[in-house]
Swiss-Prot record:
This is Exportin-1. One of its GO terms (molecular function) is small GTPase binding. SMART domains: CRM1_C, IBN_N. The gene is Xpo1. Residues 411-481 are annotated as: Necessary for interaction with RANBP3. The modification N6-acetyllysine is found at residues 446, 693. Found in a U snRNA export complex with PHAX/RNUXA, NCBP1/CBP80, NCBP2/CBP20, RAN, XPO1 and m7G-capped RNA. Component of a nuclear export receptor complex composed of KPNB1, RAN, SNUPN and XPO1. Found in a trimeric export complex with SNUPN, RAN and XPO1. Found in a nuclear export complex with RANBP3 and RAN. Found in a 60S ribosomal subunit export complex with NMD3, RAN, XPO1. Interacts with DDX3X, NMD3, NUP42, NUP88, NUP214, RANBP3 and TERT. Interacts with NEMF (via its N-terminus). Interacts with the monomeric form of BIRC5/survivin deacetylated at 'Lys-129'. It comes from the Eukaryota. Residues 327-450 are annotated as: Necessary for interaction with Ran and nuclear export complex formation. The keyword Transferase does not apply. HEAT repeats lie at residues 217-240, 241-277, 354-472, 515-553, 560-597, 602-639, 775-813, 885-916, 917-954, 1002-1039. GO terms for cellular component: annulate lamellae; Cajal body; cytoplasm; cytosol; kinetochore; nuclear membrane; nucleolus; nucleus. Mediates the nuclear export of cellular proteins (cargos) bearing a leucine-rich nuclear export signal (NES) and of RNAs. In the nucleus, in association with RANBP3, binds cooperatively to the NES on its target protein and to the GTPase Ran in its active GTP-bound form. Docking of this complex to the nuclear pore complex (NPC) is mediated through binding to nucleoporins. Upon transit of a nuclear export complex into the cytoplasm, disassembling of the complex and hydrolysis of Ran-GTP to Ran-GDP (induced by RANBP1 and RANGAP1, respectively) cause release of the cargo from the export receptor. The modification Phosphotyrosine is found at residue 454.
Amino acid sequence: MPAIMTMLADHAARQLLDFSQKLDINLLDNVVNCLYHGEGAQQRMAQEVLTHLKEHPDAWTRVDTILEFSQNMNTKYYGLQILENVIKTRWKILPRNQCEGIKKYVVGLIIKTSSDPTCVEKEKVYIGKLNMILVQILKQEWPKHWPTFISDIVGASRTSESLCQNNMVILKLLSEEVFDFSSGQITQVKAKHLKDSMCNEFSQIFQLCQFVMENSQNAPLVHATLETLLRFLNWIPLGYIFETKLISTLIYKFLNVPMFRNVSLKCLTEIAGVSVSQYEEQFETLFTLTMMQLKQMLPLNTNIRLAYSNGKDDEQNFIQNLSLFLCTFLKEHGQLLEKRLNLREALMEALHYMLLVSEVEETEIFKICLEYWNHLAAELYRESPFSTSASPLLSGSQHFDIPPRRQLYLTVLSKVRLLMVSRMAKPEEVLVVENDQGEVVREFMKDTDSINLYKNMRETLVYLTHLDYVDTEIIMTKKLQNQVNGTEWSWKNLNTLCWAIGSISGAMHEEDEKRFLVTVIKDLLGLCEQKRGKDNKAIIASNIMYIVGQYPRFLRAHWKFLKTVVNKLFEFMHETHDGVQDMACDTFIKIAQKCRRHFVQVQVGEVMPFIDEILNNINTIICDLQPQQVHTFYEAVGYMIGAQTDQTVQEHLIEKYMLLPNQVWDSIIQQATKNVDILKDPETVKQLGSILKTNVRACKAVGHPFVIQLGRIYLDMLNVYKCLSENISAAIQANGEMVTKQPLIRSMRTVKRETLKLISGWVSRSNDPQMVAENFVPPLLDAVLIDYQRNVPAAREPEVLSTMAIIVNKLGGHITAEIPQIFDAVFECTLNMINKDFEEYPEHRTNFFLLLQAVNSHCFPAFLAIPPAQFKLVLDSIIWAFKHTMRNVADTGLQILFTLLQNVAQEEAAAQSFYQTYFCDILQHIFSVVTDTSHTAGLTMHASILAYMFNLVEEGKISTPLNPGSPVSNQMFIQDYVANLLKSAFPHLQDAQVKLFVTGLFSLNQDIPAFKEHLRDFLVQIKEFAGEDTSDLFLEERETALRQAQEEKHKLQMSVPGILNPHEIPEEMCD
């Protein structure tokens, strides 16, 4: 069978592509089937045939046959793809009679298929695709070649309800294409013309919608009309909304009909979102009428949370749409309702609904409600941030300090507080969670959705606390009592309460915060003693740790408490339940960062600073921790030591602090001095890696003073580096590159990497560049550069490049003299690893360009000093970078190029020869990425670079002729150069299009956003053949706009003395 199929495919390939014979529709159906249901070689063959056929310039002439005679739906879809392709790219070069023919054919087909209601249901997808084809034709034809389209479609709609229903879909699609998705699909000018045409002819469409809504008994048609209307509401002239019966029709006629209520409510939401001041009365009517209908459909005493969980999809959607309506209306027009006493009751009912909907257990709906509560609380707080004297709720309603708007929302806000406390999302810091099976485990994946929800809830609760902190405290204290007495005890309830308590840190006055926190922590510690079972203890422990980590201000002010908390964390470091140790270390590091000074001072009632106690017992504290937890612990203690300002004391602390790792290090180094083979022992190498990781984390926290420890191990460490490098090279020579995957070799590479990390980490935090350059850099270069150059590519450490980049960034001019040596060792050999493709060695790739960027930014003179051949390589590598498909590399490449151009411009001597050699080349390469669709993400940067380059030409900064031997000015030459470049790349463009594009590159080079849109317009144009008729590109109109931009720019320049060259100033201004 496969053999026959392959023969068939081969034969088919020839036959289907032979346009001199009639199309064999059965054969085409077979090939399409083969594409969807075949496999391997035959599927590939089918793919190839169909692609060739689709790309054939005459393929569209076969579409009618395909649509009429094919029995296979997929073949029909394929036929429509061919048609869509020709409409989008070659329409302008088809003879007019053929365009008319295609148009008539498509319209006829749509009318035929959509006039029959049973057909409409059965062939929904097919009609959908046909509609899209018609809209693509409209974007080319209307209004110029089809001025009567709107009246045609409106007229046809009155002949048949089924046809009318489909026409509504076409109008909806057209609206979306023109108003919602036009950016990057059609040029700005054309989009504007289409929008104007739609607005101008909207009255006919609106009458049709009204006619259907008032007269039709056909439910699917009415639904389609409402859906279409929904798409129109965000752009139609406002008179159609507010000066017709539209609002009352939507509310009275459709809102309470189950089939239409969702789309009607969406329409009302869209209208509610309009912000204009002149239609206040209409907004009031919209609100009161909607609320009246709502109360009938969903009485105020409904338990919406329950109704939602038992509801069908349609009912659940209604509740979601209700939340959107209320949120939109209250945000936009809430203050209007507050001002009218007769609307107060309706406002309170709306808020009541919002509270009920906020209890629904569906995150998406809660997020919508939260957006409103956040808006309201923030607005009330910002109106008078400092009027939170006592508790408004407790002091009775007649409290004169309270701003009147707050008074109005008092009781509602108290309910929102309770809601926030009961539903608080999980913060990022909490690692101990209950999983879906009800087990308490460590969380490994961060849930970004939940983190964002937490941030929004936290912000809202902080505002609510500012508005009335006593009420917040009462709610929280009562809920905590119910945890302790067991009436509300559950992991979930305890979690949400503690997360809420942690989230309002800083929102209370310090005295209130102190009183409140002492109660909270005491109760939680009591709960920890009272509850049995490891899971219970783990949950309570995680909550205690989260809360104490959130209140550094309180801890700083209460030493006894801080000490108790830290000792409790040390206790938790021995608790082996999943996640507890991790969280203890994480909380410890947060507290160490925020309270660092308090650990190095002698506190009242203490005989020594607490740091000494920690260092004396360090062995006991960390004995149950895993290696990575030990590293975190070391970093935390490092922050404390970094806070000691007395250098002698600090040095003594660092020695004591690094005692354990140094003992192990010294013994390994001693053994290695006697017998170097110890450095091939897996356990020893692993130990070295762990010790260095400890040093890396310690150095990160201590900063520059760590030099005393680094100096102690520096030369031994570099010797170990060299020795391990030799071991790795020997292993590769003996056993090939595969050996780099072996555990021992990987451990050796870890030691090398951590060595580089330690050095670069310290350099980036050091504060004496000269000392670093003289004492630390020479032995480092000696150990790593030659080793890097000599190694096989697979064994080169990418960290060598990043370390060099960090050193250059930090030391700047102090290292310029070493750049040639660094470049000799790493530049060419790395370039050869990454210039074969865009994928291999991703880390080397990224770091290589970071190094280039560092040299370019901080040691630019070194670039000018390297030989021309090497400089050309540098430039080639930058061009290679911005052509990358890896986004970070491409971005770095563009960044380097932009900085390079700006640096060159500062160097008068070198600049002109640079321009002469490279300017046109760079332009050409930038245009090649601008017009490559896989690089659209870099468009802003492309625009900035091109604008800068065209500006250099225009302002005469390039004095050397870019085209030696030609008498024309550089500006004229570049205009021709770019025009010819684009004409040869896109021969289908008309001269007028290219000329206008090039003009814009000069006119808009001071206005980056406009320049970027100009590029985007050009990208739209290169996708299609324009033919002779370029009228729908509106070139004259665009030309006028560009001329105005040029004049504006000139005016601006004239207003700043000295910006314009004296020879560019008009005569009358010279006197």
